[in-house]
Amino acid sequence: LRSENKNRRGGKTKTTKHGKSNRRSKKRNRRNKKKISRVAKTGRRRSKSINSIKENKTMEKQNRKQQKKPISLTEKELFIFDVEGVIVPSIDEPAVPQDVLETIEEIRKKGKKVAFLSNISRTPFFRVAEILMDLGVAKSQKEIFTAGKVAVEYVKSKSQKKIPRVFVISERGLLIDFEIENGVEVVFEKPVDFVVIGMKRNLNFEELNFALECLLEGAELVSCGHTNYYKGKFGSKEGIFIGDLPICEMLSFASGKPYVKIGKPDPVIFGFILTEFEINPNYAVMIGDKIETDIYGAKNLGITSILVQGIETKKHFVPVRTEKEIKPDLEIKSLKDILAFI
């Protein structure tokens, strides 16, 4: 009783040294438990992250194996070749390497069909056909497809009239394609059924305003090619010129009317070739040197795509940009490398 009274002052009990040490040990135990819990959680997190890393590495290895797995082209029936950059440096510089000629000939010997595709509209179709046949690349005009030629066929197929009236904003190449074709009439006065846009370095507002009036009165809008802008020369001026797509975008915005694109990578030009050859996309191959047009367009239709490090030429044209990551089914350094897969 005396010791209890001595340890009480003002109704409070003093804590003995032994009591303090007990509380301290309890606190230490609690802290240790928390540390152990944190370490355990961290360990679980680390083990999960390690497992995740291992899984990712395994998937990457599997993907690499799949990519490295060689594809077979033996069942393919139609081989479509880009012209500028794969067959010739440029249609304006028509020289074809010997190994390119030999490769195409070997593909023919294996019983395959071949086609040659270009977004060209600055040069008329008949001239492109002449060049490719004179070089020994193409056997006939039926194997050759240009944006200009397909644009003419598209207008004829979509018109509700026997002979559609067409207003063309372009340089001579595309204009000639429409002028010499039976079944269409090139006009410079109303009424107009189709407004077709190509590339024109001396474009003026009078043409644009007339095109807009025609669209507002019911004409359809068609873009021939697939170019934002390009480098070129006109008279004494050398530099950048506006392409067909921005002109169509402007007229489409002003008139509120959509437009059809004729040219890689859009499906109309690929679909036209497949229809002409009566080939299913699964049995066709596209060989090109540009991801944004050749490869992207082929993959959209289920056509096997091959990227070739061809003849570096495209000095005059800037490809249309795309934010999507596009990978070809096969990459080769030289066109002759394709023979190993057929």
Question: What would you call each of these model-derived segments?
Answer:
Residues 63-94, 100-101, 105-110, 121-126, ...:
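Asp-based, Mg2+/Mn2+-dependent phosphohydrolase catalytic module
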